[in-house]
Amino acid sequence: MPDMKLFAGNATPELAQRIADRLYISLGDATVSRFSDGEVAVQINENVRGSDVFIIQSTCAPTNDNLMELVVMIDAMRRASAGRITAVIPYFGYARQDRRVRSARVPITAKVVADFLSNVGVDRVLTIDLHAEQIQGFFDVPVDNIFGTPVLLEDMHARGLEDPVVVSPDLGGVVRARATAKALGDIDIAIVDKRRPRANVSEVMNLIGDVEGRDCVIVDDMIDTGGTLCKAAEALKERGAKRVFAYATHAVFSGNAAKNIKNSVLDQVIVTDSITLSKEMAATGKVTQLTLSGMLAEAIRRISNEESISAMFN
């Protein structure tokens, strides 16, 4: 069996260290810095010839910097004769442009990034909760898209929810809401119907379902500015919801997210460490962060040992 080695870029160093601790190994020795003109500089400081290399790097903000770090690290590993290179991308950026709508003159950036990673020499990709599952098909290498739901469900079960109802923040999230509701004992779901006049601005229009006197659990794959989420929570409280919790795998938290969430009627927002939480978000007092390290460590172990990934969720 090839020697397994873990390396990390600068996007999520804390998560990378937690994964290494779970696997009882040390992070590999690599210097990831910048040249004086801002270009990415990578130096691998140990032998990786023939090794089973895993590079842990979310492509979150600053998205372009983190993506280039990942790409340059993959190239460095390939040129150093690594046996196999797996890109572990807890949060896969550029995933929201995955199709052209009505032949609009726009790029499909998810495909661009997939080609970028494939062409530079990655052998496999491990990620969590892709914004659109069909993005896996953009790659010419195997992709393991695992689910962060078990980590979130564990917190839901421990939270002592009273007469809970799972809420989808939009019509597109109904499948996720139904799956969560089933995992919580086949409980009720509700749907917030919204209209989005422009990017990152949303308006709640209608609520489908009964939430009066009940704890509401809003589920989504990511939270960006929090505009949709906060307006959904407001609509739920106006309809008599007792408490409103929001669960999401990816804490993008861009723009006015901290202000929006701090001033909202949300009781708590629960996210994972696929993206490092900023000090500003932590200071809101409304955000709880769970770790994906155990799940990712197990997935990495299984990939290295040629074991089934899907068996993790059976």
From Swiss-Prot:
GO cellular component terms attached to this protein's record: cytoplasm; ribose phosphate diphosphokinase complex
One Pfam family named in its UniProt record: Pribosyl_synth
Cellular localisation: Cytoplasm
Catalytic residues identified in the record: K194
Reactions catalysed according to its record: D-ribose 5-phosphate + ATP = 5-phospho-alpha-D-ribose 1-diphosphate + AMP + H(+)
Gene Ontology molecular function terms on file: ATP binding; kinase activity; magnesium ion binding; ribose phosphate diphosphokinase activity
Major localization class: cytoplasm
Quaternary assembly: Homohexamer.
Residues bound to D-ribose 5-phosphate: R196, D220, D224, T225, G226, G227, T228
Keyword list, A-Z: ATP-binding, Cytoplasm, Kinase, Magnesium, Metal-binding, Nucleotide biosynthesis, Nucleotide-binding, Transferase
Amino-acid positions noted as binding ATP in the UniProt annotation, renumbered to this chain: D37, G38, E39, R96, Q97
Swiss-Prot/TrEMBL GO biological process terms: 5-phosphoribose 1-diphosphate biosynthetic process; purine nucleotide biosynthetic process; ribonucleoside monophosphate biosynthetic process
Lineage start: Bacteria, Pseudomonadati, Pseudomonadota, Gammaproteobacteria, Vibrionales
The name this protein goes by in its record: Ribose-phosphate pyrophosphokinase
InterPro entries: PRib_PP_synth_CS, Pribosyltran_N, PRibTrfase_dom, PRTase-like, Rib-P_diPkinase, Rib-P_diPkinase_bac
Note on cofactor: Binds 2 Mg(2+) ions per subunit.
